[in-house]
Amino acid sequence: MPSCCCLLGLGFPSPPSALRILRRRMASRAFQLRLNPLTGDSEWLVVEEEEEEDHHPTPPPKQLLATTSYLDMLNDSARNRAYRRAIEAAVTDPSSRVLDIGAGTGLLSMMAARALAAVGGETRGGSVSACESYLPMGKLMRRVLRANGMENRVKVFHKRSDELKVRDDLDSPADILVSEILDSELLGEGLIPTLQQAYDMLLAKNPKIVPYRATTYGQLVESTFLWKLHDLHNNEANAADGVWLTPGEMERIVSVKPQQHAMQCDALEDEIRLLSEPFKVFEFDFWKRPDSHREANIKIRTTRDGYVHAIISWWVLQLDSAGSIFYSTAPRWARQSSSEGPQRDMKDWCDHWKQCVWFMQGKGIPATEDQVLSLRARHNQTSISYQLNINDEACDRSSKGDHLTLLPERIALYGDKDWRSALINTIKNALTVKSSPTCVVADDSMFLALLISSMSPTSKVIAMYPGLRDKGAAYLRSVADANNFSIDQIQVIGKRASSITADDLKHKKVNLLVGEPFYLGSEGMLPWQNLRFWSVRTLLDSMLSEDAFIMPCKGILKLCAMSLPDLWRSRSSLKDVEGFDHSVVNETLGACGCLPGDQQGPCLPYYVWQCGYTKKLSKVYSLMDFNFSEPIHSCFGKTKIEFSHDGTCHGFAVWIDWVLDERKSVVLTTGPDNRYWKQGVQLFSKPVEVNPGKSVMHVEASFDPSTGEITFSSSSTTCS
């Protein structure tokens, strides 16, 4: 620690008490990185841990935990029940020493402490230790433990498990390990290295492990939608508009990252053709030290003709050594058709564990019925990868300096004919009245930089590329010739707007300021956080010409009342979770219902089409306009929603429609019908029963230009 080094290096004797205080303060403080949505700048928040004797701690900041999956996980009753049963089956010795790694709210630790007490462990030397490195969650766990009278029965460590030491922290090696460091892919949260380190440093010989084993499965599928999510080259060839993001022999210069992509595949059930039966990929035995790397060669017999566009995968947990307690993330069709008990397990919709999709490259791999295909599966410490028919695309997936990897939805958008046409026509109209323009691409849009450069050979294009930076510049150099422009036309600044000066623009006025808007790394954020474009436009105000063309020229905040029972249940407030009171976490985790007053949970980003059962209960309403011809300013809007369908209204979906050209009525919508965009979802404090002609809802919203946040309020009335 630098502060300690300064004290020790001054040559003065350092009082041991002063050093202890300093070390304690540093150990009880954490820094949380937060992205400012309007600037793209990273900001640090300081999270303090209260002293042990403080029995009325301040709750951890709500915004840090409300956007996590903890609440959804705690509402997963099948998961909670399976862990409780497995822990009770494992804790049979009253002298058991239990270690919970990645303890979260402490639920598994409390289950272990209760099971230990049931076998007399409190008087026989049994113990439970909980390791949670994320300080905001650790603070919340202490509140949960106090609420359940468990603060003296579970020892909490705010450390990573590889920082724990036997004798310094743990009295002796643990003989039972419980953990849930699992993601949708299974390995992505560091399960293997965590278990390896625990076996090496923290566990006794032959420990009991919960969960005991995991098995991953896969299935070959054909799906036009999944094909569009990864094959930009062939989809833009179908668009035939002359703009080539992936020209000629460079079809992989823009691609989806070669990894498993989490997705709610049940929502695609009606548009997927299954080309094989489910097949087993890897079995991970957690009851012994796991290997870092393995490879499996699998023969798969196809069940029909088609093109393999993707492999959909999932996993099944066996939580106990007896093989009687299971949890599965299998898609609905696999659970319904499987003859295996673990796969048949039926559970509620949840969002914290999804299925995963691995994309084939290009148009897919052709297959005929009853053909045997060879699949090579590999795993390292954090991921699983696939190679179908060996010698296929896997060897070419290394990322070169000019290659760009994007999220699947962005790939699909760039290949969408209607989206491309809207931008092309708008830019073409703008260039007819602008000769030799100076154009600033205010975001990370490769498409707009290529489009303007190829359409206007005399233009000067300045690409800000705050996220792409040097990789964006290398990419443009590679595709310039194929798009018939000189790379000398384009200058990549690689800066945020706050750092740009007139010198960067060669003291020329900007005639065109354009964006999609798209900021690399912000794709999963709330829709209005792309109003960063408005903030950029404001910072560049003095550099714009009087008649500058701005695209988009306006944003319109839209909303639609929705029935979202599955999402509501996963975000609903907690009371009893397997016998433990969790009501103290509701406000911090952003739960719905049973909060003080009419307090609502936060508005969160979701692909609404993936949110289980959904139903629109009203038409689409406009709530607020953002006029980009003006500098950024506060905005307020309100509307009255009249319902067109009866049902239970759980909240509303909200998004921004981008007006590219107001005169030509060219608008790009990002609403729920467009599956390439996330919407904001504001759930109500309580669901409302609505009827057409009888129910009315008033919604108000305000935009704060200093934070980029939009706050909502709503009230409903029923006419007799």
Curated annotation (Swiss-Prot):
It holds the Pfam family PRMT_C. This is Protein arginine N-methyltransferase 7. GO terms for biological process: chromatin remodeling; methylation; regulation of DNA-templated transcription. One of its GO terms (molecular function) is protein-arginine N-methyltransferase activity. The active site is at 180, 189. The gene is PRMT7. Arginine methyltransferase that can both catalyze the formation of omega-N monomethylarginine (MMA) and symmetrical dimethylarginine (sDMA). InterPro entries: Arg_MeTrfase, MeTrfase_PRMT7, PRMT_dom, SAM-dependent_MTases_sf. Belongs to the class I-like SAM-binding methyltransferase superfamily. Protein arginine N-methyltransferase family. PRMT7 subfamily. Its EC number is 2.1.1.-. Gene3D superfamilies: Hnrnp arginine n-methyltransferase1 (2.70.160.11), Vaccinia Virus protein VP39 (3.40.50.150). Keywords: Methyltransferase, Repeat, S-adenosyl-L-methionine, Transferase. Residues 54-385, 387-720 form the SAM-dependent MTase PRMT-type domain. SUPFAM superfamilies: S-adenosyl-L-methionine-dependent methyltransferases.
